[in-house]
Amino acid sequence: MESRMSRLVPVRSIDEGDSHDDSRDRISAFELKSGNGFLEEEVVGVEDEVEEDEGEDEDEDDEGSEERSDEYWLAVSIFDGNFDGVNYKEYANYLGSPDRLPVLKEFIKLLQPLPNDLLGALGKLSSRLYFIAEAQNIDRILEELSGQWMSTHTSTIWGDNNSWCHIVLFSLLLLNSDLHNDENIGKQSRFTCKMFIENTLYALRKDCERESKELSKEREQDISQELAIFYENLRFNPLPLFTRVDKSAPSVISNIHRRQRRSSGFSTKSPSIHSLSSTISHGSSMALESHTTSNWKFHHNLPLPILYLKENFDNEFVGVNGTFWTMDGVLSIAEKKESKNRRSDDQLASTAEVKSRKTPRKLLFSWLKKSKKPSIFEESNSPVAFLNEHSQWSRARIRITEGRIFIFKLKNNYKDAFLKEQTLESMKALSSSYVVYNLFEALAEVVQENVVIGTFPSSNNILSNRGNFTITIPMGLHEYKVSLEFQTDTVEEAYAYVQSINFWAARLTPVPSAEFEIVSNDEYGWGSKLLREREKHKKENPTDRNPITNAKVSVWYPLLSLDLLYNEFDNIADQTELIKRLQEIREFTEKLECLIDKHNEMKPRMVSAWAGSPYFEKVMDNWNRRYLYLNKQYEKTSIYMKSLTLASEII
């Protein structure tokens, strides 16, 4: 069957009625060709008439909010979904109009730091903007995104070619539409990975011809591998759909620029997917890569890079089953059962629909398809599936080694002895599906510790001699967390798997070496100046019962944390020796203990200062929110510390 879209050809962006000027050509759209001729479908952009304002990227980190421009604050309100000038579904049209380029620039700046790959940048944009708009407005938004992404990512396979980034972003939107648009089902064939790569390369070659340049075979090969990774990612993870948040929710903008400039403990120049793709798996190479990249490489028989700093003792223990370094066996994995009411209109995935030249005013992008049903590898039925007598379990071979967990769901009921003799490569043929996850930021727990079983448990799955454990793995930018539950033959075996997972997670996950929380001028209820002044006032005026009524209290949320930072940076490379990492975790755990103690000591002062104030409940909510957050971090680092401590006693 011939593809409905065998060529993706860039066409010039020309305003209707304007004369063509070759010096101002740019790639702004794609004309879609079929094997049997033209489909007469295209997206036509409009040439932006507003020149970019140089010097607009000056560091404004320390400027007061009163010095920021009106365009900035307008962009902030749009970013937070609180701009009432137009319906939030029209935000893209609003930002993309020619006379609002300054606002668009500020809006894209609020997305900083942009992820290290173009698909991540596009996903971050679509998670903050309802991406339905007219063609020319979408085109301007993508062009601005391309320019700002290029300015901070200079060492990629795209070089300094802004138009290439623009082309690829548009191509990704078309691919997302093709893969996840319900209207295509049963009518037209879907893009294959090969078709997507060929069409995009065709558009890039045309752009090179227009610029009298040449796209080398070596560069094409690199780009093809990057595009293949993008395809695999989009195939399973549609672009997110922005939905308007509650106006009472905290604004996440006021500190984004601070987080970008002050997170000195980590480099903002992480390796790109391209650099990870070219990494050779040997002892001297070390990089962290996305889960999608790992899966794509594993499914295409490419070597996986080393994720950690390999030391002499690693050579002794890696591959020895039953140790912190390696756990390998056949377990039961809980399958995901989707609730009938799980999906809602707010969970629609992003799709793109290309309209014909005859209807240029129609909407370019429509969000039509609901998210695909997760596989058993995405999340389990519940964190305590073993208590549910209706839970379904599948046999799977699980291997944990060198910072990764390999999961092979078995086709047949093979004997354990036979499976243990199989290599990871031979296991592929024996599996109905398989997946590999990096254990970066992962956390495993034995479930029995957190479950109180009644006197007469009804579940047939509760067996005293069996163990159950869960593993939670953050999936990176704008994505979900994977939560899996496994069942072992014994509780001791469950503990062994948990220790191995947490051991590798502790080795891979960096520890903040700078400020754990950035100092903020916002008042959350425990500002030392406010509390001192209030205490002084009460001491000098003991009969005064007037509460605080004129304060500006913000909602607290983590300004800088591992979770937030890793959502911004898809790939973070780290090289730390095991003993040094253990020391870092100990120091960080002690710091968290001090923060928790100080936070507890603050509560009586806050109660006294804010008693009777209309802000009392808000500041107490802030206190509780921060307390729970600090405890969560403390529990996690304590688990990491315990695993590394036990391992250090062996080496």
Swiss-Prot record:
It comes from the Eukaryota. It is a peripheral membrane protein. Residues 13-26 have a biased composition (Basic and acidic residues). Residues 39-65 have a biased composition (Acidic residues). Keywords: Cell membrane, Cytoplasm, Guanine-nucleotide releasing factor, Membrane. PROSITE patterns: SEC7. Residues 362-508 form the PH domain. The keyword NAD does not apply. InterPro entries: PH_GEF_YEL1, Sec7_C_sf, Sec7_dom, Sec7_dom_sf. Pfam families: PH_GEF_YEL1 (PF23633), Sec7 (PF01369). It is found in: Cytoplasm; Cell membrane; Bud neck; Bud tip. Belongs to the YEL1 family. Guanine nucleotide exchange factor for ARF3 required for localization of ARF3 to the bud neck and tip and involved in actin patch polarization. This is Guanine-nucleotide exchange factor YEL1. It comes from Vanderwaltozyma polyspora (strain ATCC 22028 / DSM 70294 / BCRC 21397 / CBS 2163 / NBRC 10782 / NRRL Y-8283 / UCD 57-17) (Kluyveromyces polysporus).
